[in-house]
Amino acid sequence: MLVWLAEYLVQYNTAFNVVSYITFRAIMALLTAMGIGLWIGPEVIRRLQLLKFGQEVRNDGPESHFKKRGTPTMGGIMILIAIGVSTLLWADLRNSYVWFVLFVLFGYGAVGFVDDYWKIKRKNTDGLIARWKYFWLSVIALIAVFGIYAVGKDTAATQLVVPFFKDFMPQLGIFFIILSYFVIVGTSNAVNLTDGLDGLAIVPTIMVASAFALIAWATGNFNFAQYLHIPFVPNAGELVILCTAIVGAGLGFLWYNTYPAQVFMGDVGSLSLGGALGTIAVLVRQELLLVIMGGVFVVEALSVILQVGSYKLRQKRIFRMAPIHHHFELKGWPEPRVIVRFWIITLMLVLIGLVTLKLR
C-alpha cells in the first residue's frame, strides 16, 4: 500500500524512492509486525482470558503439562493481525504471489480458529472433525495451487529444484499441482504437530522464514538466480516482505510464548504459519529445501505417522508418546531442554539448507 503512495510522492521528493527497495521494506515489515505483536499482545491475552479461551491438556500427557491447563490459547490471532497489517502496508499488492500466500495464511487461520473453538467448547482436545478439517485445508490448498499453476505453468515457476544437483531441474507440468498440494497441507499439519511446547514451533518457523527471505530475494533476482543455478521467478522477490513479516510477528509472539508461556498460538496460528511456509516454498521452487530446513517439523510429523502405524499393525508403540517432543519429556528431559535443543537442530538444518544452494 505504501509502495503506491511512495510512487506518487516521489515526484515531489526523491527521498520517497527508498520505499521501492525490497531491503528497506523487508526491514520495515519485520519491525512493523513485531511492534504490532508486542503492542496488541497484552490486550489479546486479556480478552482470551475473559472469554475463557483456555488450553485443554491431554490426560495421558506429561504431568508437567497439567499446570498449563487454562492458559489462553488462540494467540495465533495476534500473529495473523501482525502479518496481515505489515504485509498490506509494505508489500507491493500488485504482486499475485503475495495474495496467494495471504489467501492460504488466512484461510488456514480460519480453519484453525474453528478447530480451536470446538476444542474449547467441548473442553477436550478433539476439535473440528478430522475429515472436515482436512477437507477445508485441501480446498484452500488446491485453490491456491491451481492459481499458482495458472500464473506460472509456462515458466520456471513449475520446475523442481533438487538440492546438490545443478542441472537437474525437471519441469513438473501437471504434477506440480500434486506436489504443491502435499507440501502446503503437509507443512501446515507438521507445524501444528510441533506446537506442543512453549516456543517450540514459533522459533523454527522464524528461522525457516528468515532463510526463505534470502532465498526469495535470490530467486527474484536474475543475476543471483543465475549464479546459484536456481530458477529465476520474477514475482518471487516480493515474498521477502511476507517472510520478514512472519519473522517479526513470530518475534512479537515469542515475547509472550517463551517458557513459561502466557499464551499459546493454537491451531489458528500453527496451521496458518505452516500453510504459509509451504506456499512460499512452492512459489520459490524450493519444496525439497523446506524438507531439509524444516527437518524438525518433518520428524515431528513422521513420529506421529510411525506411532499410529505401528500401533495399528503391531499393537505396539515405538515412542513413549507422539509427537516426539513428548517422548523426550517422558524420558525425563525438562521442557526447556527439549525446546532449546530442537531450536539448535533447526538452526543447523537451516544453515545446511542454505549451503546446499551453493553446493551443486
Curated annotation (Swiss-Prot):
Its cofactor is Mg(2+). One of its GO terms (molecular function) is metal ion binding. Signal peptide: none annotated. CDD domains: GT_MraY. The chain crosses the membrane at residues 21-41, 73-93, 98-118, 132-152, 168-188, 199-219, 236-256, 263-283, 288-308, 338-358. It is found in: Cell inner membrane. It catalyses: UDP-N-acetyl-alpha-D-muramoyl-L-alanyl-gamma-D-glutamyl-meso-2,6-diaminopimeloyl-D-alanyl-D-alanine + di-trans,octa-cis-undecaprenyl phosphate = di-trans,octa-cis-undecaprenyl diphospho-N-acetyl-alpha-D-muramoyl-L-alanyl-D-glutamyl-meso-2,6-diaminopimeloyl-D-alanyl-D-alanine + UMP. Pfam families: Glycos_transf_4, MraY_sig1. Keywords: Cell cycle, Cell division, Cell inner membrane, Cell membrane, Cell shape, Cell wall biogenesis/degradation, Magnesium, Membrane, Metal-binding, Peptidoglycan synthesis, Transferase, Transmembrane, Transmembrane helix. NCBIfam families: mraY. Catalyzes the initial step of the lipid cycle reactions in the biosynthesis of the cell wall peptidoglycan: transfers peptidoglycan precursor phospho-MurNAc-pentapeptide from UDP-MurNAc-pentapeptide onto the lipid carrier undecaprenyl phosphate, yielding undecaprenyl-pyrophosphoryl-MurNAc-pentapeptide, known as lipid I. This is Phospho-N-acetylmuramoyl-pentapeptide-transferase. It comes from Actinobacillus pleuropneumoniae serotype 3 (strain JL03). The lineage of its organism: Bacteria, Pseudomonadati, Pseudomonadota, Gammaproteobacteria, Pasteurellales. The gene is mraY.
